[in-house]
């Protein structure tokens, strides 16, 4: 029944999704304003969702242009559906323009198809179809739309300062059948304090180093600019050998007497950096072989001592595992250095319930002082957990099982979704076990089958939660 309902809307679903995907809704602080708190792209995507909601007869409520909601249903309790329309930067290497959606016979290709614009449109159409069916709602629905999920969650922080907290809810921003627990997440900077000037002449001076754009992405590109005082050819040959030995792509050029070294890695979501290749850490590994100036030497030595080849916090003394939630993970997402201001490592750390976060950070902060580094802690989100046997979770899982015959149990993840904003919040779809996960990677796509099947599952689940009860 539900799949047949969705079939009647397939063309509309694709057209509305294409319109949303065409908006480059990447956070841009340089263009932020009161009207566009995280830049014009995210604001435009939020307005787009309001426009299609108004077209279809729904009411909306805007919260300072950084978040808002689409309203449906009636009743005392509120089901929250928490989505986001911002996306991570596209990066390089796409086979098509990431913001000009390509629709093939069986897929849609663009940045945001999986994370989170495709699932957002799927959830929206589930609500729209039920409204078109004139169902007798027993709950209200707030489809809450954020614009800063990929960075600092300013959107939901602002939203929940003044707006009603849903009784229960889900975020269509992960996988089926249901994610009932999420690791704690924090970002922090390891900031280098500048050392005294060199007493002895070094052979090489690191002028600048840059790798990574987002704390929650493994950097796939790194660039170092090095002043080489002698033996330029030897350095280039050593670098080429290093690339070959480590199965890496990279390049070396000379720009106005400065040696420019680049390394290409593999970008993946920061919740599991072990499956990516961190270009920045590899390039620092090479630089450690050079007789660099004091500051640079301390910077690259720190990377090798604590960060390189340590995706589970081993070198930082933070290795920890639980059977329910898995391991601590550490993603070094941003690395910068210049010879005027010294360096910085931007880290995204995720941890399971039971990890003594404050104790571990205090110990680490004290330990690294001797190497000229300090910790600047950002936002800390504690682990989030809902019992998988809760009736709410079971209703979601039942809708999934009815349509897929897949009896996989709900599980926990290292990723963080808006679900953790709610006491009784879980992540629910929209990826299936056979979906290719290209979130935060080039050539991100969603299959039409996945898009329509997710819509159908959301349709049944929302009906079960908001109409039958």
UniProtKB/Swiss-Prot annotation:
Keyword set, alphabetical order: Dipeptidase, Hydrolase, Metal-binding, Metalloprotease, Protease, Zinc
Cofactor comment text: Binds 2 Zn(2+) ions per subunit.
Top EC group: hydrolase
Keyword Membrane appears in the UniProt entry: no
Gene Ontology molecular function, alphabetical: acetylornithine deacetylase activity; dipeptidase activity; metallopeptidase activity; zinc ion binding
GO biological process: L-arginine biosynthetic process; proteolysis
InterPro entries: Bact_exopeptidase_dim_dom (IPR036264), M20A_pepV-rel (IPR010964), Peptidase_M20 (IPR002933), Peptidase_M20A (IPR050072)
Top-level lineage group: Bacteria
EC number: 3.4.13.-
Cofactor(s) the record lists: Zn(2+)
Gene3D superfamilies: 3.30.70.360, Zn peptidases (3.40.630.10)
Active-site residues per Swiss-Prot or TrEMBL entry: 86, 149 (proton acceptor)
Pfam families, per the entry: Peptidase_M20 (PF01546)
Residue positions binding Zn(2+) 2: 84, 115, 173
Binding site for Zn(2+) 1: 115, 150, 440
Family statement drawn from the similarity comment of this UniProt entry: Belongs to the peptidase M20A family.
UniProt name for this protein: Putative dipeptidase SAB1611c
